């Protein structure tokens, strides 16, 4: 399954373009722009599993840096600052990684 099976390709392209500048990434705006906020809980979980590249059941900090590439292969990597900000927002239990429920909460709070 690919991201465009779940989200509109044009919305993804616009959202990735909107955050092309380093240190401009805002996960709340990004999730809204790609249409993730409007998706069912099931679809949000499917997106999580696409982003969980190593299939560990968590998005670790190293995977988080590549989150935009999970939506579009030609997107940029997040900066260290953006990655840490996103991890702080999503890692509710402080274990250094984002689980599927934490990701769902992160999207819902967007």
Curated annotation (Swiss-Prot):
Domain EF-hand: from-to ranges: 39-74, 78-110
One Pfam family in the UniProt entry: EF-hand_7
Stored SUPFAM superfamilies: EF-hand
N-acetylserine: residues carrying this PTM: 2
Binding site for Ca(2+) 1: 52, 54, 56, 58, 60, 63
GO cellular component: cytoplasm
Keyword Repeat on entry: yes
Key word Iron present: no
GO molecular function, one term: calcium ion binding
Residues bound to Ca(2+) 2: 91, 93, 95, 97, 102
Modified positions (Phosphoserine) in chain numbering: 2, 24
Disulphide-bonded residues: none
InterPro entries with a match to the protein in the record: EF-hand-dom_pair (IPR011992), EF_Hand_1_Ca_BS (IPR018247), EF_hand_dom (IPR002048), Parvalbumin (IPR008080)
Keywords: Acetylation, Calcium, Metal-binding, Muscle protein, Phosphoprotein, Repeat
Its job: In muscle, parvalbumin is thought to be involved in relaxation after contraction. It binds two calcium ions.
Family: Belongs to the parvalbumin family.
Domain notes: AB domain, comprising of helices A and B, is involved in structural stabilization, protecting the hydrophobic core of the protein. It is required for high-affinity binding of Ca(2+) and for Mg(2+)-binding.
PANTHER family: PARVALBUMIN ALPHA
Protein name: Parvalbumin alpha
The organism of origin for this protein: Macaca fuscata fuscata (Japanese macaque)
């Amino acid at each position: 399954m690919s991201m465009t099976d779940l989200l509109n390709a044009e919305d993804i392209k616009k959202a990735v373009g909107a955050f092309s500048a380093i240190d401009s990434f805002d996960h709340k705006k990004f999730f809204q722009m790609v249409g993730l906020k409007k998706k069912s809980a099931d679809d949000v979980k499917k997106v999580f599993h696409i982003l969980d590249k190593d299939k560990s059941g968590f998005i670790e900090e190293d995977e988080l840096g590549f989150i935009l590439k999970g939506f579009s292969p030609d997107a940029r990597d997040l900066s260290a600052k953006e990655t840490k900000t996103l991890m702080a927002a999503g890692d509710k239990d402080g274990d250094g990684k984002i689980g599927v429920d934490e990701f769902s909460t992160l999207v819902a709070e967007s």
